[in-house]
Curated annotation (Swiss-Prot):
InterPro entries: Rbsml_bL25/Gln-tRNA_synth_N (IPR020056), Ribosomal_bL25/Gln-tRNA_synth (IPR011035), Ribosomal_bL25_short (IPR020055), Ribosomal_L25_dom (IPR029751). One of its GO terms (molecular function) is 5S rRNA binding. This is one of the proteins that binds to the 5S RNA in the ribosome where it forms part of the central protuberance. Part of the 50S ribosomal subunit; part of the 5S rRNA/L5/L18/L25 subcomplex. Contacts the 5S rRNA. Binds to the 5S rRNA independently of L5 and L18. Gene3D superfamilies: Ribosomal Protein L25, Chain P (2.40.240.10). Signal peptide: none annotated. GO terms for cellular component: ribonucleoprotein complex; ribosome. It comes from Trichormus variabilis (strain ATCC 29413 / PCC 7937). Belongs to the bacterial ribosomal protein bL25 family. The keyword rRNA-binding applies. This is Large ribosomal subunit protein bL25. Keywords: Ribonucleoprotein, Ribosomal protein, RNA-binding, rRNA-binding.
Length: 99
């Protein structure tokens, strides 16, 4: 089963706390072979479904960023969980192939 996640580029100057209140989780896409990282936002409901279906550093995820016309294979590199609430706080994707 292939997992596909659609993300948006994070708006310049946006505060992570405000994004979370709006129902988005901040995320980063780290490049393959030293490419620059990209700041993203993912819908919180999509993140919850993703975490139920994917294992960190094991499950391949097709990531789609329409604003940048980028689609590629990634793995979930890291998930930060809020210590008190137990909800996802930040996620990191690692590109596994050139996108």
């Amino acid at each position: 089963m292939a997992l596909t996640v659609e993300t948006k580029k994070r708006p310049e100057g946006s505060k992570p706390k405000a994004l979370r209140r709006s129902g988005f989780i901040p995320a980063n896409l780290y490049g393959h072979n030293g490419r620059e990282s990209i700041s993203l936002v993912v819908d919180a409901k999509v993140v919850e479904r993703l975490l139920k279906a994917a294992a960190v550093k094991k499950t391949e995820i097709e990531l789609n960023i329409p604003e940048l016309e980028w689609t590629g294979k990634t793995v979930l590199q890291e998930v930060q969980i809020h210590p008190a609430k137990g909800t996802p706080y930040h996620i990191s994707f690692l590109a596994t192939a050139k996108g």
